[in-house]
């Protein structure tokens, strides 16, 4: 029986529990590579798998979680050795049973760009290697993922190199976000669009704490939902998890009414947990839940549901824009970012991105623009090109669920574009034109809209993901056909039930007082059912029209949005004076405009003391970003971009100081290290970035750092503040030993500890001076310690 049949025939599918917990019980050394045991201790693995099978597991995960080329370097085995050995061990354990074997794949352990340095295609290649090596598995499971972009690379690697079923589970925190800020809705929309077989959550929390996460996920998908919780929460002092097998099963039972189909255990669980889970599920019926998933698009952190008029900003397009064309030819990405940020502040919900211009490599520029935009803004993008190759490159580079602009009713367009929309799980704008051009009548445009819808459904694209553009013709040239456009919008909306799109500004080409024409055409189209006006949101009367329409039609309940924008005193824009640079530098930093920020810094240095720029502009901008991050209004990718922009300013200042012969003053030296036996350093690296941008000299000792190395470095470099990180309960003892050795050697220092498994109580228990729950708190501690 294969996985897909298993899902259809069984009420519930039972997974196994933790592998690491079991290997540690058998004697896995701290800091050892679990995947090396596939070859060195195969009998251990066979025994563990058999214990889970006997407990009731329908599927066991092969011991391949960290079997990628980077993590295996330490033990000397290759992917091609470790993965087949793991699958063979699992197969041996499954003999005589119907138990399936999953190729278990975890995160690479490096951040992808724009947050990190690993490229999408590099990540793809790493996953491809694992998938090819695990071809003999029954299904592929990607688990414990926190970055949706990395997971997309993994899924594409699987779908393009294997026919095996795909299961994806991400790790969410109690704030309903992953470590990188991924929203549950964005995860569901993106992964279901990519065509995986099941999605869910694993790790981080116990079944009780995961309930609200699972509840939200079950509202956003019709795929089978997988839940693999931890055995509660770990006690960092005892390394024990606080949820017993009986309580685990009891809390898991409460997930059943939500529609959960697949259940297992993660960290801290063992065969006894799976046995209790299987006993609880015996005789119970799966609760089938069908959701009407709305028309929506998303970035990783933000989902836009098309349940009311939403503004698509039109300004990222070179047509008729001399300055934009110059920016494209000069490869000036900051100009594009500036246009994006300006539109979002003005009220755009989605941004159209078109970089088509003779004389440039449109494919390369589109990819560059998409990546840069997603590093700075969180609204979804509409990918706009007439060239299928450009669209595919943009779709591959995009993180989330975008809109494709566009397909039309020509057979060649349908054949070239719709397969891409289906493969990458996008929504699509259908233009009501064919080889004969734009029909004059509303009836013919309606027919073309229906053709596009029918073809999309044939390709397996959801009806909700098809948006129709009935095409705005210029009133100056075809005044008699203006009403044909709005009448077509009305029919498409009411008779086909599709979302509608119009390029509003086209109506007024060639006419005086264009704003008046645009404003009235927009209101007319909205009353006929326009959902997605493509327009210039920077023109206040246009965004005001949309807001007023929402108020008058009771979409904006109690006029909350309208009053928030127009109820207070009118804000006046700052005067365009010589002080503009001082006003704009914090803005440039906060919005991730690196080139503009660096240029403004250089200009300010001609008239302002370097340290005044740092203390009065750079640090406050970073503080503001940090505060927004703590409130959950800003997420890790944007925080890193802000820090990177500040770093560009610091580099300008540093070079200026060197050129003048002055001595750069450090705010203080700090050692950072991930403790012995722990190979996870993503969190520590983020702390490093922020500390450096606040002006501290960071000595980064890396990961898996020996206790004595920390002591020696502190003494040799006269460092008085040390930060230690641990991400695994098994390496907490290394953190304790490092602190102990520093104290025994009378090193004059204060110690900060942090990491996913560290708590304030544990910090106090081992004699650390400070506990930092995140990177921003590490900065706050450093500032307090150094008095700056």
Regions found by a protein language model. Give the residues of each.
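Domain-level signal for soluble alpha/beta catalytic cores
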Residues: 1-467, 473-788
């Amino acid at each position: 029986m294969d996985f897909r049949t298993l899902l259809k025939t069984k009420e519930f599918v039972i997974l196994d529990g933790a592998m690491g917990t079991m290997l540690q019980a058998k004697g896995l050394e701290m800091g050892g590579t679990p995947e090396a045991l596939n070859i060195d201790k195969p009998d251990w693995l066979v025994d563990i798998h058999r214990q889970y099978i006997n407990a009731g597991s329908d599927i066991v995960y092969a011991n391949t979680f960290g079997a990628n080329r980077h993590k295996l370097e330490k033990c000397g085995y290759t992917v091609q050795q470790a993965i087949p050995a793991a699958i063979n061990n699992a197969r041996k354990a499954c003999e005589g049973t119907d138990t399936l074997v999953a190729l278990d794949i975890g995160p690479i352990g490096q951040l992808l760009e724009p947050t990190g340095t690993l490229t999408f295609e590099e990540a793809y290649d790493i996953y491809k290697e694992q998938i090819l090596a695990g071809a003999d598995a029954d299904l592929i499971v990607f688990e414990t993922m926190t970055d949706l972009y990395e997971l997309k690379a993994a899924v594409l690697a699987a779908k393009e190199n294997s026919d095996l079923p795909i299961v994806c589970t991400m790790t969410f925190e109690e704030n309903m976000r992953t470590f990188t800020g991924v929203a549950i809705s964005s995860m569901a929309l993106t992964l279901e669009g990519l065509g995986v077989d099941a999605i869910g959550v694993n790790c981080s929390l116990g079944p009780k704490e995961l309930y609200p996460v699972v509840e939200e996920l079950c509202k956003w998908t019709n795929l089978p939902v997988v839940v693999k919780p931890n055995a509660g929460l770990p006690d960092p002092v005892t390394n024990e998890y606080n949820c017993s097998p009986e309580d685990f099963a009891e809390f898991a039972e409460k997930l059943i009414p939500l529609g959960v189909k697949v259940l297992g255990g993660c960290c801290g669980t063992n065969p006894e947990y799976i046995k209790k889970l299987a006993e609880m599920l015996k005789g119970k019926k799966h609760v089938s839940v069908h959701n009407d998933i709305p028309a929506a698009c998303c970035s990783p952190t933000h989902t836009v549901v098309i349940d009311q008029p939403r503004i698509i900003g039109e300004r990222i397009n070179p047509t008729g824009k001399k300055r934009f064309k110059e920016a494209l030819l000069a490869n000036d990405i900051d100009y594009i970012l500036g246009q994006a940020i300006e539109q979002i502040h003005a009220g755009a919900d989605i941004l159209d991105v078109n970089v088509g211009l003779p004389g440039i490599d449109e494919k390369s520029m589109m990819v560059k623009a998409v990546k840069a935009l997603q590093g700075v803004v969180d609204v979804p993008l509409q990918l706009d090109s007439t060239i299928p190759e450009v669209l595919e490159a943009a779709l591959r580079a995009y993180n989330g669920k975008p809109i494709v602009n566009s397909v039309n009713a020509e057979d060649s367009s349908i054949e070239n574009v719709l397969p891409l929309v289906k493969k990458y799980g996008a929504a699509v704008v259908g233009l009501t034109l064919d080889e004969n051009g734009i029909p004059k009548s509303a009836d013919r445009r309606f027919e073309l809209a229906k053709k596009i819808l029918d073809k999309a459904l044939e390709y397996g694209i959801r009806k909700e993901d098809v948006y129709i553009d009935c095409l705005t013709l210029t009133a100056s040239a075809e005044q008699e056909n203006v009403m044909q456009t709005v009448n077509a919008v009305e029919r498409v909306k009411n008779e086909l039930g599709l979302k509608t799109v119009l390029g509003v500004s086209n109506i007024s080409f060639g006419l005086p007082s264009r704003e008046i024409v645009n404003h009235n055409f927009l209101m007319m189209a909205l009353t006929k059912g326009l959902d997605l006006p493509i327009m210039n949101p920077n023109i206040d009367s246009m965004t005001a029209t949309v807001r007023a329409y929402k108020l008058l039609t009771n979409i904006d309940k109690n006029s909350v949005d309208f009053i928030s924008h127009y109820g207070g005193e009118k804000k006046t824009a700052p005067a365009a004076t010589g002080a503009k640079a001082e006003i704009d530098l914090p803005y440039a930093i906060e919005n991730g405009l690196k080139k503009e920020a660096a240029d403004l810094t250089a200009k300010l240095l001609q008239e302002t003391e370097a340290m005044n720029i740092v203390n009065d502009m750079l640090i406050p901008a970073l503080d503001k970003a940090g505060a927004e991050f703590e409130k959950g209004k800003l997420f890790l990718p944007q925080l890193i971009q802000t820090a990177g922009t500040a770093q560009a300013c610091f580099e300008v200042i540093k070079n200026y100081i060197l050129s003048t012969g002055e001595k750069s003053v450090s705010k203080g030296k700090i050692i950072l290290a991930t403790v012995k036996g722990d190979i996870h350093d993503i969190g520590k690296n983020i702390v490093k970035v922020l500390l450096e941008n606040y002006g501290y000299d960071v000595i980064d000792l890396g990961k898996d750092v020996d206790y004595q190395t920390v002591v020696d470095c502190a003494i040799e470099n006269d460092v008085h503040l040390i930060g230690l990180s641990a991400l695994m309960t098994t390496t907490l003892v290394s953190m304790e030993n490092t602190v102990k050795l520093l104290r025994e050697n009378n090193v004059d220092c204060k110690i900060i500890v942090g990491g996913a498994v560290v708590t304030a109580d544990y910090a106090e228990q081992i004699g650390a001076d400070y506990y930092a729950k995140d990177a921003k708190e590490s900065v706050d501690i450093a500032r307090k310690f150094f008095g700056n």
